Amino acid sequence: MKIMNRKKITENRVVACFAAILLLLPSPAGAQHFDAHIAGRKVTLQECFDLAARQNLQMQAGKKSVERAQVMQGTAWELDKTEVTFSQNPATGGESDNGFTFTQSLDFPTVYTSRRNQLKAETQAEKSRLNVVSQQLKAEIANTYYQMLYQAHRLQILQRIDSVLERYSKIAEMRYKAGESRKLEYLSADRKCNENRLEMADVKSEIERLQIDLMSQLNTQEPVKPAEENLTAIAAQNLNTYNYQQSADGLYQQDKLIALDKEIKAAKTGFAPSLSLSLRTQCVISSWNPYNIDRSRFAEGNFFGFEIGVGIPLFYGSTKAKVKAAQKDRELAEIEMRQEQTEKERDYRLCTKRLQAASNRLKYYEQNNQAHSAQISKLSAIEYENGEISYIEYVNAIEETIDVLMKHADAINEYNQAVIAIQRLTGMM
């Protein structure tokens, strides 16, 4: 009986020693079974912003809108076509019905000034709208960028766990073959290892999907990925105050109101009179006089004459309707601005609460659970090697470690997303 106990103890020590040797071997990290590499050129977030500013189709369309508005400013001084009339009446002498007439109609000068101011205000509104598009695009890029970092960090965690599970799957197999455990323990270890690799495949697929989204946002065919190696929290600065009037959205709405004010003034110029100017020059064809009219009194040469006319708007019902319609447009835009301001201020309060909750959660995992999870993993590994705990207890410890690491990654990601949302609202992207 003593000989059998000694033999059992010896076998236990051999298995434990061999398991310890396996733990000291270099970690394969599942490299032979799973390719976790993500192809692509490494780029920083600022490089993504710069690339999108040049290549993104939304930005290009916004720039074209600004250019169009700038070109339209040249239409402010549009004049009616100059009318040129030639008349020749052989039945008269050298009167005004024998000559050239140049006629030009034009609006009152204030009309052109108002129109020019309106077009300049519309150009500024287009520039503000482009800034809104830029801020929104930057927020989308930053969101995708940090989501890629988050998923890459999760993949790193799963790779480390894969190494541990693969080693202990081998240990469970040896213990089963040595008769120290049942086959169920080995099968459970192998299942855990395979499930972890399936999770790794899902995470890698999500990274590749996010990479495609980022490429679309940058409008590039070249695969790109974040330059950072580790997932870190974004440095949050000056996020405690929010002024809608100073945000990109607020400035755009204010510029729209200014443009509509200018439009109202331009519509009111319809009440102003119009002007017309005519210049006439004598043109008598001396060789063509079928009625033998005496033209001797016009023999001293040609003469010039002019005419100035003023158009008075006696029927101005259409102009009044245009002014009222422009005023309604302005009232509607003001209501929309107040509505947007209410929504943005509400969103800021919600984002602030979200950021505070994410910050508290992040501090908790950074101060306590990181070291705690590492200690659990280390102690459970030693105890399992020495046969002090069962594989089920060890797996529970591993799952607790994974849970803590993943929750810490979730906390960083949630914090970063909250910061990005506030930066988008405040226009600090």
Locate each region found by the language model.
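Bacterial N-terminal signal peptides
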Residues: V15-P26
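Short, charged, amphipathic alpha-helical segments
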Residues: N117-K120, K183-K192, K324, Y391-E399
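Acidic, low-complexity, intrinsically disordered peripheral segments
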Residues: K2-T10, A16, G30-H37, K407-M429
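Small/polar, glycine/serine/threonine/aspartate-rich low-complexity segments that form flexible
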Residues: Q32-K42, L79-Q118, S278-S318
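Amphipathic alpha-helical coiled-coil scaffold segments and their short linker/junction regions
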Residues: R41-Q55, Y186, D190, T220-V284, ...
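A glycine-/polar-enriched beta->alpha junction
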Residues: D50-A61, E67-K81, F100-Q118, S128-Q135, ...
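Periplasmic alpha-helical coiled-coil/stalk elements that build and connect Gram-negative outer-membrane
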Residues: K2, R6, Q136-A248, C351-R354, ...
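Amphipathic alpha-helical coiled-coil segments
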Residues: A61-A76, V133, L137-Q156, M174, ...
